[in-house]
């Protein structure tokens, strides 16, 4: 895969430039554009993934299906499709917006900061997973209600962005509705 960049944003969310992805994520990470996607199968189960230990931020942490950064000139929806192919080896239905204005800042135990405007999407797949070990070390298809209960009971066991997304009542409602409509 070619070198990825992040799209830097000002406080109003307006693009101001780009920076190489790995150079962008430091203890002083600038605000940038990302996306987060929750992927469901035909049974309405959510794919929960565990980030590879080689990941710079939050290695080994359980999270929602796929996250990433759109590239300059790339629509968020197209970036979701690209990363699902790259990380999971799957084709997906067109991503649907769940939480378009999600924004967060969090620091991992190693001091790496995520500082993102990060629209949240949901999509479906019927494809068999072909996991990219550089991205994902483990995965599990789970009932959404069980995952949400797990997040509520043990938020420390999941990525902070997943916890914050699930804490939004409207996003939670939309994810539940999405899971139920196979």
Swiss-Prot record:
<dbReference type="InterPro" id="IPR056375">
    <property type="entry name" value="Idi_bact"/>
</dbReference>
<keyword id="KW-0963">Cytoplasm</keyword>
<feature type="binding site">
    <location>
        <position position="25"/>
    </location>
    <ligand>
        <name>Mn(2+)</name>
    </ligand>
</feature>
<dbReference type="InterPro" id="IPR000086">
    <property type="entry name" value="NUDIX_hydrolase_dom"/>
</dbReference>
<comment type="similarity">
    <text>Belongs to the IPP isomerase type 1 family.</text>
</comment>
<feature type="domain" description="Nudix hydrolase">
    <location>
        <begin position="30"/>
        <end position="164"/>
    </location>
</feature>
<feature type="active site">
    <location>
        <position position="67"/>
    </location>
</feature>
<keyword id="KW-0414">Isoprene biosynthesis</keyword>
<dbReference type="InterPro" id="IPR015797">
    <property type="entry name" value="NUDIX_hydrolase-like_dom_sf"/>
</dbReference>
<keyword id="KW-0460">Magnesium</keyword>
<keyword id="KW-0479">Metal-binding</keyword>
<feature type="binding site">
    <location>
        <position position="87"/>
    </location>
    <ligand>
        <name>Mg(2+)</name>
    </ligand>
</feature>
<comment type="subunit">
    <text>Homodimer.</text>
</comment>
<dbReference type="InterPro" id="IPR011876">
    <property type="entry name" value="IsopentenylPP_isomerase_typ1"/>
</dbReference>
<keyword id="KW-0413">Isomerase</keyword>
<feature type="active site">
    <location>
        <position position="116"/>
    </location>
</feature>
<protein>
    <recommendedName>
        <fullName>Isopentenyl-diphosphate Delta-isomerase</fullName>
        <ecNumber>5.3.3.2</ecNumber>
    </recommendedName>
</protein>
<dbReference type="GO" id="GO:0004452">
    <property type="term" value="F:isopentenyl-diphosphate delta-isomerase activity"/>
</dbReference>
<comment type="function">
    <text>Catalyzes the 1,3-allylic rearrangement of the homoallylic substrate isopentenyl (IPP) to its highly electrophilic allylic isomer, dimethylallyl diphosphate (DMAPP).</text>
</comment>
<feature type="binding site">
    <location>
        <position position="32"/>
    </location>
    <ligand>
        <name>Mn(2+)</name>
    </ligand>
</feature>
<dbReference type="GO" id="GO:0005737">
    <property type="term" value="C:cytoplasm"/>
</dbReference>
<dbReference type="GO" id="GO:0046872">
    <property type="term" value="F:metal ion binding"/>
</dbReference>
<keyword id="KW-0464">Manganese</keyword>
<comment type="pathway">
    <text>Isoprenoid biosynthesis; dimethylallyl diphosphate biosynthesis; dimethylallyl diphosphate from isopentenyl diphosphate: step 1/1.</text>
</comment>
<dbReference type="GO" id="GO:0008299">
    <property type="term" value="P:isoprenoid biosynthetic process"/>
</dbReference>
<feature type="binding site">
    <location>
        <position position="69"/>
    </location>
    <ligand>
        <name>Mn(2+)</name>
    </ligand>
</feature>
<dbReference type="GO" id="GO:0050992">
    <property type="term" value="P:dimethylallyl diphosphate biosynthetic process"/>
</dbReference>
<dbReference type="Pfam" id="PF00293">
    <property type="entry name" value="NUDIX"/>
</dbReference>
<feature type="binding site">
    <location>
        <position position="116"/>
    </location>
    <ligand>
        <name>Mn(2+)</name>
    </ligand>
</feature>
<feature type="binding site">
    <location>
        <position position="114"/>
    </location>
    <ligand>
        <name>Mn(2+)</name>
    </ligand>
</feature>
